Amino acid sequence: DGITVNRISLANIQKVSNCKADLYIEKRLTGRYYLIRNVEIPNGVTLILDNFTNFNTAAGEFGLYIKLTDGDSFELTGDINPGNGTTTVPGTNTIFLSEVSVGDDIEISGETRTVTDIITDVSLTVSATYSDDLTTDTTPTCNPTALVDVIIN
């Protein structure tokens, strides 16, 4: 309330994929005004919006909202055999440090888990164990989260 926004920066900090962003101002009764809509931000790129026209930021007037959509799913490098009864997932010829981020979903042999830690290029941990009877998956899939740093000043 009563805050002036001069610049907004959105930086895609994902390791591999692009993300999409919507940035809009919404007034309680009159709807949304999109500053950007469905804009794809490549990984490693910062989108800067500045020179905002002043708008009434009195209590209850406007809200500033950012909606982020993750990038497309992609096939991970290497093979994964998670059927070891633990949340530690071993890989063979994988490059987890380069391709995966904490919060990403990993699908292995039809089962999906969320990455909670990346230990090395060939080892990460997930939110729950995979079934013990899974065989090695040579085409594991990553569904990345939308990792974007937002700076408003």
Region locations from a protein language model:
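Extracellular and analogous surface-interaction loops
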Residues: D1-G2, I13, T53-T57, N93-F96
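C-terminal interaction-tip segments
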Residues: D1-I3, R7, A11-V16, K20, ...
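Intrinsic-disorder/low-complexity, polar/charged segments enriched in Ser/Thr/Lys/Arg/Asp/Glu/Gln
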Residues: I3-R7, T46-I48, T88, S123
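Short, surface-exposed beta-strand/strand-loop-strand elements in extracellular ectodomains
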Residues: K15-R37
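Beta-strand-rich, repetitive solenoid scaffolds
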Residues: L23-I25, I36-N38, D50, K67, ...
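A short beta-strand motif that forms part of the nucleic acid-binding face
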Residues: I25-K27, T53, A128-Y130
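Aromatic- and Gly/Pro-enriched, solvent-exposed loop/edge beta-strand patches characteristic
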Residues: L29-S73
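Autoprocessing Asn-cyclization modules and mimics
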Residues: S73-P144
